[in-house]
From Swiss-Prot:
This is Ribosomal RNA small subunit methyltransferase G. The gene is rsmG. It catalyses: guanosine(527) in 16S rRNA + S-adenosyl-L-methionine = N(7)-methylguanosine(527) in 16S rRNA + S-adenosyl-L-homocysteine. S-adenosyl-L-methionine binds at G78, M83, A129, E130, R144. It is found in: Cytoplasm.
Length: 211
């Protein structure tokens, strides 16, 4: 269950990240956390079993990329339990966020969150990345610990164009993966992230297509 300590940790952590949550956004994020805790027992949505670790390792980790979000149409590839896409949809109600995952249990959970939190700007897509064909390119494509940079860009290149930004959330800075980037992608910028309550390194890599 969600406790007052979880609520306080979320408020304090968001402020440390420079994010001013509205009361409604704070409530929605905690409602999402409650669903994640409940469904994780049966659906194995995340390897993090301890609810006391979920605020920092899931909610605040997802919120840490908010300052880097530009544009209005985003897709979270390999979304799993909905991170970071669901927190993004809560923070950017005027935008459109798609969650893509090939695991039916995980997309069922995502759909339940969409319904219970009334996230009309959230779309859930049950598909493999390479099989999904968007009607128009996305402004941004994001993944969190999804795959290597080579696979991430290779499986999603058809979802974007030269104006799209690919955001890869990583732990250690993946120097070896950058060497293997496809020739038509380049590293636009890299950012070391500090996530309140999280130990270890966190990095955000922003990639672009050159053609």
């Amino acid at each position: 269950m969600v406790t007052p300590q979880h609520a306080q940790e979320l408020s304090t952590g968001a402020r440390e990240l420079g994010i001013d949550l509205s009361p409604a956004q704070h409530e929605q994020l905690l409602a999402y956390l409650a669903l994640l805790i409940k469904w994780n027992k049966a659906y194995n949505l995340t390897a993090v079993r301890n609810p006391d670790e979920m605020v920092s390792r899931h909610l605040l980790d997802s919120l840490s990329v908010v300052p880097f979000i530009e544009g209005t149409r985003w897709i979270d590839v390999g979304s799993g339990g909905g991170m970071p896409g669901i927190p993004m949809a809560i923070l950017f109600p005027e935008g459109k966020v798609a969650l893509l995952d090939s695991n039916g249990k995980k997309t069922r959970f995502q759909t339940q969150v969409k319904l219970e939190l009334k996230l009309d700007n959230l779309e859930v897509i049950h598909s493999r990345a390479e099989s999904y064909q968007p009607e128009v390119p996305f402004d941004g494509i994001i993944s969190r610990a999804f795959s290597s940079l080579e696979d991430f860009t290779g499986w999603t290149r058809h979802m974007g164009d030269v104006n799209t930004r690919w955001l890869a959330m990583k732990g250690l800075h993946p120097d070896d993966e950058l060497v293997a980037l496809p020739s038509d992608f380049h590293l636009d910028s890299a950012h070391a992230l500090t996530v309140p309550g999280c130990q270890g390194q966190r990095h955000l890599l922003i990639l672009r297509r050159t053609a």
